[in-house]
């Protein structure tokens, strides 16, 4: 079989270049990988892990007057982005399209129309049917819902709009699931499961029998929800309830939940590792989607 080769790729809101990880794992070759990102810690991590990523800065600067920062419109094979989701999500203070952060979606749409990539992927959270309908009309495709639980022990439902054919949510093959546990210390689990109190079921844990974590988001990494309540996903009673011990997942454990290589984010502070991972793709989900690109050579 011929290996898939792409000309140029543009990753908007690139974060820590999770898309680049997926391309590498799939053995997809490319000539240029352009990344638009403004968060310094994310850029630092991307550069530490990959020296072939071309960082082109703010999405607002990728314009015709700036010659699209070197991107040739007729040579772009893949456009990928997941703009900040809080403005769309019903958990995002009901701001929806009025949220300034949602304006980044329209930058994605602008570049989709101006650069005319062969393939595109747009990712976002589950949201109200009305907003889904509006986005679908703008992008010209219906979304596919994929839960990261297909590939790692967390519940992280996301919508993916793409023109890549034959992408669907499906049952994973055995080798899709990471073989090793996400946990550095398994000793916490049995005691935690035994001593969970009634009414505390929202503090889900990944246990050896396959139960799953709730979705990982940045607010959960901070340990609080948007309204100030304790976060669900990363504040876990991995110790003894009787003494009130609460431990967060380690950055390494979070990397494994997001199917990012071990220690990929070790070049920044623990807080910034949590933030970067919480805002990033689950890499194996992106692998699943990219794996459907037809090889037309």
Stretches with model-predicted labels:
Residues 1-297:
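Conserved active-site and SAM-binding loop architecture
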């Amino acid at each position: 079989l011929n290996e898939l080769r792409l000309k140029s790729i543009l990753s908007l809101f690139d974060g820590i270049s999770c898309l680049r990880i997926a391309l590498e794992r799939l053995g997809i070759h490319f000539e240029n990988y352009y990344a638009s990102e403004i968060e310094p810690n994310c850029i630092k991590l991307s550069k530490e892990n990959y020296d072939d990523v071309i960082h082109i800065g703010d999405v607002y600067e990728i314009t015709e007057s700036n010659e699209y920062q070197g991107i040739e419109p007729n040579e772009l094979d893949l456009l990928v982005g997941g703009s900040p989701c809080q403005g769309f999500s019903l958990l995002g203070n009901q701001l929806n399209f009025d949220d300034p952060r949602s304006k980044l979606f329209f930058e994605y749409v602008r570049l989709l129309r101006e650069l005319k990539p062969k393939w595109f992927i747009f990712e976002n959270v589950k949201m109200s049917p009305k907003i889904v309908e509006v986005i679908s009309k703008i992008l010209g495709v219906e979304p596919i819902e994929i839960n990261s639980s297909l590939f790692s022990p967390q519940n992280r439902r996301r919508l993916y709009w793409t023109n890549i054919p034959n992408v669907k949510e499906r049952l994973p093959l055995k080798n899709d699931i990471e073989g090793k546990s996400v946990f550095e210390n398994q000793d916490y689990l049995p005691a935690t499961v035994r001593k969970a109190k009634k009414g505390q079921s929202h503090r889900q844990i990944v246990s050896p029998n396959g139960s799953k974590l709730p979705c990982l988001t940045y607010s959960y990494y901070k340990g609080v929800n948007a309204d100030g309540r304790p976060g669900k996903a990363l504040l876990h009673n991995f110790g003894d309830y009787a003494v009130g011990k609460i431990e967060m997942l380690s950055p390494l454990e979070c990397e494994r939940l997001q199917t990012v290589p071990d220690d990929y984010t070790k070049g920044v502070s623990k807080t910034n590792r949590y933030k970067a991972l919480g805002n990033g793709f689950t890499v194996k989900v992106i692998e699943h989607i990219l794996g459907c690109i037809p090889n037309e050579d």
